């Protein structure tokens, strides 16, 4: 099966796993997905992630994070830039998510980073998704 948009597939799997209250989630691995998982862990949206290999295929395992009253750390995750409609911004145009309560994840010439890091570094790029 060929995926047109692997990032949207990752975000949809995360959303579905949270709605089903699953503790962990397996997705096909790629360098971009590993970088997105790294940012989600740094920002406290997932508890951990690791790359494994099952049946000769690389798999990224995400461990989802829940609070003491079983509320998920991720309330919503949305895809911004899509294959049919790419969204590029300069470092001065990076939007804030929920007034700073959420994050943007961008791909920049300096790698994958949050909107806050991109503003601080002074680089723009493609907005992949918003998480809050």
Question: Whereabouts are the PLM-identified features?
Answer:
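Core subunits and conserved enzymes of cellular information-processing
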Residues: 1-132
């Amino acid at each position: 099966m060929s995926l047109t948009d692997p990032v949207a597939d990752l975000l949809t799997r995360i959303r579905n796993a949270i709605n089903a209250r699953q503790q962990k989630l397996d997705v096909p691995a790629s360098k971009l997905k590993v970088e997105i998982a790294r940012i989600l862990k740094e920002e406290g949206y997932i508890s951990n992630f690791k790359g494994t290999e099952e049946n000769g295929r690389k798999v990224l395992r995400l461990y989802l994070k829940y609070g003491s009253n079983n509320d998920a750390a991720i309330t919503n995750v949305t895809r911004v830039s899509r294959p049919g409609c790419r969204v590029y911004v300069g470092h001065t145009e990076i939007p804030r998510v929920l007034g700073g309560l959420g994050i943007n994840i961008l791909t920049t010439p300096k790698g994958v980073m949050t909107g806050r890091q991109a503003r601080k570094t002074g680089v723009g790029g493609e907005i992949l998704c918003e998480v809050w």
